[in-house]
């Protein structure tokens, strides 16, 4: 038979009858692919050709297959509802409601005053409040006293002296109440004090602050303040200071700002305005906050029945007070006074500062007078920083200049 007549093999059948690749060959091919063998069969990864641990790897694979199968069998054989990870039940967390008020007592070397104010707080008729004492690195027994006798008080101890204003802000930062109340450590509030503050606070939702009636500790018929007022000359005034209390201010509840020695602040306003300006350090920081709150459209209310007795020297002349009042008055005006009112009251403002400076110069030998002049000089030297703050404060005003001007007093 010729070659042409010979039957040709069927390609499909020959492929079917071709011997298949062995399992070992398939494994070798897979290893070569994973190892990246080149076209000549040279392996670029010598570890793949190392059979030192091949038996161990194979044994591990067998063990894992058996373990998986065993787990599956056990799971299928488990009773209905079986859970290999039992659910652990825990008692519900106890929710601690935030108090309505947080009373913050800044303290510096006031161990001799603290028992009076803290015992008075324990005697308050209104009880939904917490007490926070911020100790400003006292060198007396204040911290030891608080830890031993007043464990219910939240104590924050500054590692170094940071100033009164910083302590107020620190306490307010951890306060949980809707009403943030600042109370000096050298005071004694009456048992109804906090209840009266709360009553007025709730009745005046537009009040950023509610301030107390402060009377002298040792002359309890004599006023320290019934609220802060601001003169047309930009100088703050304690309304009623040194006057005998006959209730003459009880009906005049609208004030410019509250005295930080015993005033309640609305939490959201405090946070929105950033609290006290820590650059003030001490003195007039409360008037500065009140000025900013007024510019933002909020009110300040006097609560005449919220009575607090305050240790205050009638003689004055404190060097720190003289310095910081002299400096901070200038900063207060520079930060907050609208431009139109600066122009309108320019003569009164300049005249007021000159009169204070001249009076201090005439008494130059007095330490308090020197401190006042140094404070005024420091106020002028620090104007640049206050003018930067002014550029943030003034565009946010929510009150007309004419309405603000009506709040200023002539004397």
Question: Positions of the model-derived regions?
Answer:
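N-proximal low-complexity "stem/linker" segments adjacent to membrane-targeting elements
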Residues: 3-7, 53, 60-123
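A conserved acidic beta->alpha catalytic loop
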Residues: 120, 127, 135-144, 160
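Glycine-rich, basic loop-to-helix element that forms the pyrophosphate-binding segment
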Residues: 157-175, 185, 196
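Short aromatic/hydrophobic "clamp" motif used to bind/position activated sugar donors
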Residues: 180
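Conserved donor NDP-sugar-binding/catalytic core segment of glycosyltransferases
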Residues: 188-235
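A short, conserved alpha-helix in the catalytic core of glycosyltransferases
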Residues: 254-307
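Active-site-adjacent helix/loop segment of glycosyltransferases
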Residues: 300-388, 402
């Amino acid at each position: 038979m010729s070659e042409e007549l010979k039957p040709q093999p069927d390609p499909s059948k020959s492929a079917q009858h071709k011997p298949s690749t062995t399992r070992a060959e398939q494994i070798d091919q897979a290893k070569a692919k994973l190892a990246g063998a080149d076209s000549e069969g040279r392996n670029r990864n010598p570890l793949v050709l190392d059979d030192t641990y091949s038996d161990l790897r194979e044994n591990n694979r067998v063990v894992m297959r058996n373990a998986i199968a065993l787990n599956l069998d056990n799971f299928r054989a488990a009773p209905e509802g079986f859970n290999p990870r039992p659910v652990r039940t825990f008692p519900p967390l106890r929710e601690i409601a935030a108090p309505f008020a947080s009373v913050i007592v800044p303290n510096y070397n006031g161990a001799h005053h603290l028992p009076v104010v803290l015992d008075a707080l324990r005697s308050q008729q209104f009880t939904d409040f917490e007490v926070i004492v911020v100790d400003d690195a006292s060198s007396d027994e204040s911290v030891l006293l608080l830890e031993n006798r007043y464990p219910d008080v939240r104590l924050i101890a500054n590692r170094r002296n940071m100033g009164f204003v910083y302590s107020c802000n620190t306490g307010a930062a951890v306060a949980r109440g809707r009403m943030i109340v600042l109370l000096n450590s050298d005071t004694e509030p009456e048992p109804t004090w906090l209840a009266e503050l709360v009553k007025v606070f709730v009745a005046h939702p537009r009040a950023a602050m509610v301030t107390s009636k402060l009377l002298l500790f040792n002359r309890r018929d004599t006023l320290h303040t019934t609220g802060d007022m601001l003169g047309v000359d930009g100088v703050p005034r304690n309304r009623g200071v040194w006057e005998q209390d006959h209730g003459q201010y009880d009906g005049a509840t609208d004030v410019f700002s509250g005295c930080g020695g015993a005033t309640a602040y609305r939490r959201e306003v405090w946070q929105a305005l950033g609290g006290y300006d820590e650059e003030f350090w001490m003195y007039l920081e409360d008037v500065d906050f009140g000025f900013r709150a007024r510019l933002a459209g909020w009110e300040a209310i006097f609560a005449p029945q919220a009575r607090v007795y305050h240790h205050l020297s009638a003689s004055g002349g404190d060097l720190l007070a003289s310095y910081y009042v002299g400096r901070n008055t200038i900063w207060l005006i520079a930060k907050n006074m609208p431009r139109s009112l600066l122009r309108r009251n320019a003569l009164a403002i300049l005249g007021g500062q000159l009169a204070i400076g001249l009076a201090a110069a005439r008494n130059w030998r007095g330490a308090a007078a020197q401190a006042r002049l140094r404070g005024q000089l420091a106020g002028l030297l620090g104007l640049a920083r206050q003018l930067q703050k002014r550029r943030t404060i003034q565009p946010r005003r929510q009150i007309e200049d004419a309405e603000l001007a009506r709040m200023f007093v002539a004397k």
